Structures are given as C-alpha cells and as structure tokens.
C-alpha cells in the first residue's frame, strides 16, 4: 500500500508540473496571437481551405461497453417466485451452505463454490433451480448446433465484472432473453435449459478458460465459412488390359534426366513448404507475443454435453459465446471447479494440472465428483469389484436404501418462468437485427431477414493481411429475393463476380459468372435444365465466341460452339439486334441416337460459313476404330448468269469405313446437302436467338438489382400488404355492423322523454313537439358532421399546398432522402384528401335518406303512433 501511495503522489506531482509549464507557454504565446489576429483577415479561400482540412479530420468515438447490471433491469413486474424463496428453496440453501462449509474445511486451498448467487431481485437462488428445461416450438432449436448458434446470435456478450471470480448475480433466462445481454454464465444457463429440454444430457460448467475464449476473441480463429470441405479423391478403376491392345511406343527419354527433374521439383516444393512454415511460425509468434498474465485464472462458463442421450457418441464442450463445439481435451479449457444441471450439483475433485485432458466425466464416481444431493440420477456409476462384493449382503442393501431415503432431498422446481421466444424475436435473432464477428483475416456480418431492402442477411469479407486492410473477396447471402438470388461472390483481385440463384428464376438461371454487365464480354451462365424447354445447361461467352451445352433434347444436341468475326462498321449503336456479329463457324456435337445406325448418326458437324463448307463426322461403331466422315462444298444454287448449278461429285468428299451403294449416288448427296443448308440456317437463327437471350438476361438482371424486390409469404400477415388490407377491411365491416346493431338498439326518444315529468301521459301536442325536437336535433347533427368533414378536408388541402410551396422553394438543396419523404407525404396527403372527399359526398347523399328514415321511425313508434295518426 505504501508503494502504491508513493506512485500516486509522484503522478500527481508530474501532472502539476506539466500544467504549470502549459500555463507559462500559454502566457508567452497569448500576445503574439492577438497581434496576428489584428494583422491578418480570413478570406473566403482561407475559410474554404480551413473547412476542407477540418473535414478531413476523423474523430474516433470510443465504443461504449454493454452495461447489464441490476440497475438496468425493471423488477417491478417480475412474479413472486423471483422476489422470494419457498420453504423448500430455503432448506436447499441451508444444505448448500453446509456443503460449502465442509468443502472449505476439507479443501482450504480451493476457491469458494459458486452455489447460490443473487438473482435480479437480489434474492439468493441455487444455481440448479435457475435452469428451466424447455423444449422450444421451433424445429431449428431441436439440435444442439443450431440451438447454440441461435443463442450466440441472439445475445450480446457482456464481460464478467471481475475476470477472476464468478459473478455475484445470475439472472433468469427470461430476463436475459428480454434484454438480449448476458455474461458467460447467463449464456450457459440459457443454452443448458434449452438443450435439456431438447433431450440432451447437458450441464453448466464453472471453470477456467483461455483469454480468447473468455473475451469472445475470434481474431486468431479461422472463419468456418472460409474453410473448404475436403474433396474425397476417388481412384479411377483401371480397366484390365485387352488381350490384343496396341502396345504404347517405347519411351526413349532419359531416365537419369527424369530423376534429376523430379529431384529439382521436389527441392522447389520443399523450399516453398519451408518458406510457408517459416511465415506461419513468424505470424504465430507475432500473435502469441503478448502472453496473458492471467492465464489459467480467468473464470469462464460453458456447457458440457455427455454421451448417451440423443445418440451423442462422445462427450464434448460447447462454448456458448461462439456456438463452437470442442473436444474435452481442448487447450482452450484450462480447468473445472464444478458443474450442475437441473437435478444436482457436482464438484470436481480431480487435478487439473494438465487442463481438462485427464478428466474423467463419470459423475457417478464420488471419488472424482463430489455430489451435493442424494437420491438423484448418478450417470456412469461404475463400481469396483471390492465394492460389488461388499454390496452382496441383503441386509446392508436394505439398510443403505433406508438411509438414502432418509437423507435424500429432491431438487425444488425452477423459480424461472416458462422460457418463451416470440416468432418476431426468433426471426430477428441478432440484437437490433445486426451482428458483426471478427475472425482471422475475415469479418462476418449478419442481419435479420427483411432488415435490408435488398434482402442481405449475411456478408463474409476475407482480407489478405491480419490488419484487415486489403480485401480479397466478399460473399453475400440473400433471402426472400424475388429474383431468387441466394449468394453473390465478389473477387476483388480478379474482379470476377459470381451470382448463385435458387430454382424459380424467370430465365431458369442457376449461376452467373461475369466481370462486367456489358454485353459481348467474358461471362458464364449456368441454368436449371429441367426448367428450360431447350435443355440448356451452360452458356459460355467471350467477345469472339459463344459455347452452349445441352442435355435431354429430342434432337440429341449436346454442344454448340459459335465463332464470330469482326462486326461491320455502322453509325448506329452496335448490338445483337440492330447489328449482329457475323458468324464465321458453328460447331455442333450430338449424343448417340440409338434409333439410328452409327454410320448414319452424326456425332459432329461443322458449318464453315466463310469458306462455304460443311464437315460431318459420324459416330463410331463399337466394332470399328474409325468413323465415317463427309465434307460438302456449299455453293450458291445459281451462278452469276442465273443458270442453275448442278450437283457434281467433287462437291462431296467422303470417307467411309464400309462404302455403300446408295451413299455414292449424287441424288443422296444432293438431298443431304439441301438438308444441311436448312439446318445451317436453323443453327444460325438459334445462335442469334441465344445472343438476344443474353441481352434479355442482362437487362433483366440490371432491373432486378435496381429494384431488389423481396417476396413476402401469404402467411406473414404483418408484412403482406394484401393480407393486411383484407384484414383491415374485414375489421372495418365488422365494426360498421356492430355500430348498426348498436344504433338499432338505441332509444332515440329517451333524451327528449327525460325532459317530461315521470309517469305523465303524453298529449297530442307534446308528441308533435317531441317529434319535431328529435328531427331538428338529428338534422343539426347531420349538419355538424358535414361541417367537420369539410373543415378536415380544407385543413388537409392547405397543409398539402404549403408543403408543395416549400418543395418549390427548396427543390435545389434537397437530398434524395428529403425528396423521398416529400413524395411519401404527398401520397399520404392525397389519400387522406380523397377519402375525406368521398366521405363528404357520401354524407350528402345519405343525409336526406337518414332524415326520412328517422321520420318514418317516429311515426311508427308505438309511443307516438296513436297521437300522430291525425298528422299522417
């Protein structure tokens, strides 16, 4: 303490000296500054320069730590179980205190047990009663991984007040869910409650963790979304060599040169691997340069899931902050003091010198785990042979059972209310709808559905360096998009964009890879072939070529490759519709058609449009090693003089494995060439249509990206405008029907009959006066209602005119947001004006009818009908 006081006094003296020096410098510079102010005047250019310099200054606002204390919790509306203890709970607290005293006496070097912290009402509650097993109604929360991920996203982490001690307060899960904040013990309690409700054998653990684990620091961890799944390489089964297979030619390359080349390649790989390992070691050394002075002392809480229930094959840990699962031998977990569930409490009696690697989670072993209560489940109870032999005596068994019954004490029910998560909260997930997680060379951002106008729900940004300054690539996940966009992958280095779509796009688009949205650029489009009539699977486009792959077509077309030549120069804008690119070559390939013989089934045909040639290659028969080929010289049907050109043998060059008589005839060759001419026209037309389709898809994608409309389910009544309007209309109809019923039950003569003496019989003149007063009063009310509607109509009109005048005066300086607000106000104002106008016109039409209807009712009223007969 004396050393601390001396340090404080030295710091105060240094601050006083520094303040005195600052004051002296201020006095010295005060007068020259005043002289300068008098001499220099600030011009407009100097002011603009100063404003520019000031705008470049960035002020960093320190982030406020999340505060979650008792003072921030409203305890006025909490139920009685939160504010007091039952007799059974008080008995349990006494048992826990007795257990704690015995434990402290037997283990004086161990820290005090975490048994009964205070709740939000400052009432001591045993930790096991804070767990409320609950099965949530959402299927996603039935498995441990998705349940832990939901809690990690839904809550915000608050660090422990003292990193070396467990918290003094342990709040209920309902309070934690309400405020969406909590420390590691709050996270673990909520997660354990939901896992036990889902059928898992889960326990809350009070122990010690690493600094990264306690601070939820993932900057040294690799993001799971960046790790690529390991591809299992399937070894190709080598076909057995055929008996009469052709032997490969003899290899005449030097074996010595091959060995030297292999050694050189291995040396290069070893050098690269060594360099990579050195770089990783250097980076790891930089990351671990700052050792934690509190290593092994930081208190942390997590969840233990034991094997057995829900087909869990092996026990594991769950960190509630990150929702990650770890082995029970992981280095992040440095020791365990105790653990508990909703039935019992266990104290770890094993040594944690080797972290948690040597711990045995046999909770039925009283040597390793000291339990608090008797008469509860003891999982994995394993008895030694000596104990088993000692338990053979029937009398001892009966006596032991009686003693256990006398000493057993059941755990009281949980004092926490039923844990409930509303559908809105379950959908929103993250606090305020957004959460950011920083990983090693990556940043993960999450949003709630419908929070962003473009449907963005997740974004993963990967960086090249540890400081996260140079972006490598971005992945963005979308939901509820009308264009079925699911994932957008942007590579910042190559500039390649890849869009992934779910089934349902208007053009059956599945994947779209591109660097620019301009037409006739490098791009790849993949389609859902089952949703297209033409069976198109993939289309690859470059400035000079276009390649299409097909499947399941009736003509067995599988491949089409089009080569384009330079476009003819025109003054108008070049496009596939106005000035298409000239096609130079079209190559088409076909699957095997089993209905045709292989000699007549075309496998590939090439239209050399510029050279006026057509090349055909047929499928190869199974018993042949070569295939038939033909080449046609396509000429014009008439010459320059108009004479018809006759088919000649030199116009068809063919190679046939087994020549046939009918294929040599000129008529057969002429008919084949005429058919190929028509097919060439069809292929050129289909290629031109493909170009137009690309333009249509690009235009559609630009419109979709600009509009980014979101779809809303018909069952989502809060967001679906049509359902909302229909519901409001139904409510309005029911309200009007209710008003009509109330109006029918009203006694319209009651206010006027009350003015007469009670029990007096009406005279004829009194009846006439009552009728007139009632009609006059109703007429006045109709007039007042019309005046009220007219006044509201005029008020809305004047306010709209003022707003329009304000817009005309400030139109130049308005921002796009202000213009959107103005247009929205005008739309709403016009809607209100139109409704008021309709109400006024309707009131004018119905007022006379209502007046006549009331007059008729008065004449038919049984109290006046006899007295008013004379006037009818």
Curated annotation (Swiss-Prot):
Coiled-coil residue spans: 1-64, 254-292, 676-706, 780-805
Stretch list, region Disordered = 1-40, 231-281, 385-410
> Sorted alphabetically, which keywords does the UniProt record give?
Cell projection, Cilium, Coiled coil, Cytoplasm, Cytoskeleton, Differentiation, Flagellum, Spermatogenesis
Could you tell me where the Acidic residues compositional bias lies?
A: 385-398
Please list the GO biological process terms of this entry: flagellated sperm motility; sperm axoneme assembly; spermatogenesis
Locations listed in the record: Cell projection, Cilium, Flagellum; Cytoplasm, Cytoskeleton, Cilium axoneme; Cytoplasm, Cytoskeleton, Flagellum axoneme
Among Pfam families, the record links this protein to: CEPT76_peptidase, DRC7_C, MORN_DRC7
Q: Which GO terms describe its cellular component?
A: cytoplasm; cytoskeleton; motile cilium
Look up the domain of life of the source.
Answer: Eukaryota
Residue stretches of biased makeup (Basic and acidic residues): 16-40, 231-240, 248-281, 399-409
Which family does the record claim for this protein? Answer: Belongs to the DRC7 family.
Function per UniProt: Component of the nexin-dynein regulatory complex (N-DRC) a key regulator of ciliary/flagellar motility which maintains the alignment and integrity of the distal axoneme and regulates microtubule sliding in motile axonemes. Involved in the regulation of flagellar motility. Essential for male fertility, sperm head morphogenesis and sperm flagellum formation.
Q: How does it assemble?
A: Component of the nexin-dynein regulatory complex (N-DRC). Interacts with TCTE1/DRC5. Interacts with DRC3 and GAS8/DRC4.
Q: What name does UniProt use for this protein?
A: Dynein regulatory complex subunit 7
Organism of provenance: Bos taurus (Bovine)
